[in-house]
Amino acid sequence: MAVERTLSIIKPDAVAKNIIGEIYSRFERNGLKIVASRMVRLSQADAEGFYAVHRERPFFNDLVKFMISGPVMVQVLEGEDAIRKNRDLMGATDPRKAEKGTIRADFAESIDANAVHGSDAPETAAVEIAYFFPELNIYTR
């Protein structure tokens, strides 16, 4: 497997629960290095731009409203098969369907307030990382 980078967002519901450290520990225990991170309060334009691919979906406005409701932690994760590992750690989008021990099963409240976001493919990861870290040099530890 190749070393990959993926974007992860700890959403407002999880930030409000003060579980950033627990989520970071799960990343690191599973071989994912945090090579860039920052806390940000998304504007409506930021959230709409990031989730533009979902603009025509019925949940778009609720998603944007939720993502601007509080600060988020945005991080770049790096490691072998990072995209798949992160998605496995997150669990199913609907926390009621997420496997026990996943971030969403343990911490998410609903399909809307589902604690985390993660890139779903290498192409998506590249676009999402550039969205939040456009001019940042990211270095491997």
UniProtKB/Swiss-Prot annotation:
Its cofactor is Mg(2+). ATP binds at residues 11, 59, 87, 93, 104, 114. Its EC number is 2.7.4.6. SMART domains: NDK (SM00562). GO terms for cellular component: cytoplasm. The keyword Transferase applies. GO terms for molecular function: ATP binding; metal ion binding; nucleoside diphosphate kinase activity. Its main location: cytoplasm. GO terms for biological process: CTP biosynthetic process; GTP biosynthetic process; UTP biosynthetic process. The active site is at 117 (pros-phosphohistidine intermediate). It catalyses: a 2'-deoxyribonucleoside 5'-diphosphate + ATP = a 2'-deoxyribonucleoside 5'-triphosphate + ADP; a ribonucleoside 5'-diphosphate + ATP = a ribonucleoside 5'-triphosphate + ADP. It is found in: Cytoplasm. Homotetramer. Major role in the synthesis of nucleoside triphosphates other than ATP. The ATP gamma phosphate is transferred to the NDP beta phosphate via a ping-pong mechanism, using a phosphorylated active-site intermediate. PANTHER family: NUCLEOSIDE DIPHOSPHATE KINASE, NUCLEOSIDE DIPHOSPHATE KINASE DDB_G0292928-RELATED. This is Nucleoside diphosphate kinase. It comes from Nitrosospira multiformis (strain ATCC 25196 / NCIMB 11849 / C 71). The gene is ndk.
